[in-house]
């Protein structure tokens, strides 16, 4: 396969470097937030923890403000990353997209099939099929960072690109499968607002303020429309102008991405993790762990992800459609495939959408996500550490 040109600009390279660093550190903060949530939820503080999440402010519970509001900012960040990578970064050509693209597709398909197989015949739990289909980029890069600079940058970029494409798949799934009860007037208002945002982009309006104000309005209309409000963040991101490479110093997209990265990595995602990882383990027995939902989620993440990602990558490389990341080998690629089973943030998020109003099933999702992601993190780091220690 021919070598693809590197179209990343110097500032784009700097942003990628900071991105990997902040996501890795943010992943460690997210781990701490998740652990803190588990401790608090199983301590005398649990009553205050859960009552705070369910308390209402301005018509929405604190939990919904986090899941529908703060996570819209997270999805705005995801959208900016996707647009930057596709236009001028590590996904700028079809050759660069090939390996993470095939791997992401396999990594979404196989976990979903495993979950469906385990929950077949149960319409209530079958709606959670997409829960194990996503990779948590912050958590996965955070675990990978524990190996330090022994990990080739190409592997980190592969994992980041795969997770970004995973997020794109998750956004598509949410839009088509987890939006219901549409309010057509509000949906029409959302489309009109989006059309104005597109017009601003076409008119080459480069000031961020008009986009952000209209983005807030778009979020409100989407929230009221029945489509999940976080999709407003992605739609806004796609309207923010990127500009030409020679204009990168004035690129609104790069400027907004730079300003948002640390807030998202060290505030938004950890707050989400703390609010959603808390589950009381007092009523959970070993028998509950093999209930269809936690079993399907855990096996989908731990088994399905590594099989789907690695098998799709192998087939793509063997067929000459992609190449191994530079400086890596098959075992290292397999180790990264295992780490793709860390599905924390997006898996918990989709779990809330799949089982609205069913706290029991949401708690089972949390248990499955924690077990599957934990096993993937431990197995992946053990394999990669043993492999890198030989070099």
UniProtKB/Swiss-Prot annotation:
One of its GO terms (cellular component) is plasma membrane. It catalyses: Na(+)(in) + 2 H(+)(out) = Na(+)(out) + 2 H(+)(in). It is a multi-pass membrane protein. The chain crosses the membrane at residues 25-45, 56-76, 98-118, 128-148, 157-177, 180-200, 208-228, 264-284, 297-317, 335-355, 364-384. It is found in: Cell inner membrane. Keywords: Antiport, Cell inner membrane, Cell membrane, Ion transport, Membrane, Sodium, Sodium transport, Transmembrane, Transmembrane helix, Transport. InterPro entries: Na/H_antiporter_dom_sf (IPR023171), NhaA (IPR004670). GO terms for molecular function: sodium:proton antiporter activity. The keyword Zinc-finger does not apply. Coiled coil: none annotated. It comes from the Bacteria. One of its GO terms (biological process) is regulation of pH. Gene3D superfamilies: Na+/H+ antiporter like domain. Belongs to the NhaA Na(+)/H(+) (TC 2.A.33) antiporter family. Na(+)/H(+) antiporter that extrudes sodium in exchange for external protons. This is Na(+)/H(+) antiporter NhaA 2. The lineage of its organism: Bacteria, Pseudomonadati, Pseudomonadota, Gammaproteobacteria, Pseudomonadales.
């Amino acid at each position: 396969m021919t070598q693809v040109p590197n179209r990343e600009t110097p500032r784009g390279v700097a942003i990628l470097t900071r991105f990997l660093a902040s996501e890795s550190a943010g992943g460690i903060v997210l781990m701490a937030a998740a652990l803190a949530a588990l401790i608090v939820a199983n301590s005398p503080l649990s009553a205050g923890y859960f009552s705070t999440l369910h308390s209402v402010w301005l018509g929405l519970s604190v939990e919904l403000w986090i899941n529908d509001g703060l996570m819209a900012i997270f999805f705005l960040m995801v959208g900016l990353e996707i647009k930057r990578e596709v236009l001028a970064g590590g996904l700028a050509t079809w050759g660069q997209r090939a390996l993470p693209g095939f791997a992401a597709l396999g990594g979404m398909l196989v976990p979903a099939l495993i979950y469906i197989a385990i929950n077949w015949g149960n319409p209530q739990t079958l709606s959670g099929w997409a829960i194990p289909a996503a990779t948590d980029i912050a958590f996965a890069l955070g675990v990978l960072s524990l190996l330090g600079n022994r990990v080739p940058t190409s592997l980190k970029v592969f994992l980041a690109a795969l997770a970004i494409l995973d997020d794109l798949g998750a956004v598509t799934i949410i839009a088509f499968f987890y939006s219901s009860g549409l309010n057509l007037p509000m949906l029409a208002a959302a489309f009109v607002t989006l059309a104005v945002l597109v017009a601003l982009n076409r008119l080459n309006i480069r000031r961020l303020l008009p986009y952000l104000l209209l983005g807030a309005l778009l979020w409100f209309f989407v929230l009221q429309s029945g489509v999940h409000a976080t999709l407003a963040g992605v739609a806004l991101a796609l309207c923010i102008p990127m500009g030409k490479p020679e204009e990168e110093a004035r690129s609104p997209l790069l400027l907004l991405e730079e300003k948002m990265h640390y807030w998202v990595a060290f505030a938004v995602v950890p707050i989400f993790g703390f609010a959603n990882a808390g589950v009381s383990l007092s009523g959970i027995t070993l028998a509950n762990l093999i209930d269809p939902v936690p079993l399907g989620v855990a096996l989908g993440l731990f088994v399905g992800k590594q099989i789907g990602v690695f098998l799709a990558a192998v087939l793509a490389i063997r067929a000459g459609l992609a190449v191994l990341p530079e400086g890596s080998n098959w075992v290292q690629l397999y180790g990264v495939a295992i780490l793709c089973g860390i599905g924390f943030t997006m898996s918990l998020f989709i779990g809330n959408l799949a089982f609205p109003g069913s706290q029991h099933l949401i708690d089972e999702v949390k248990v499955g996500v924690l077990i599957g992601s934990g096993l993937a993190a431990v197995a992946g780091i053990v394999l990669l550490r043993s492999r890198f220690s030989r070099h």
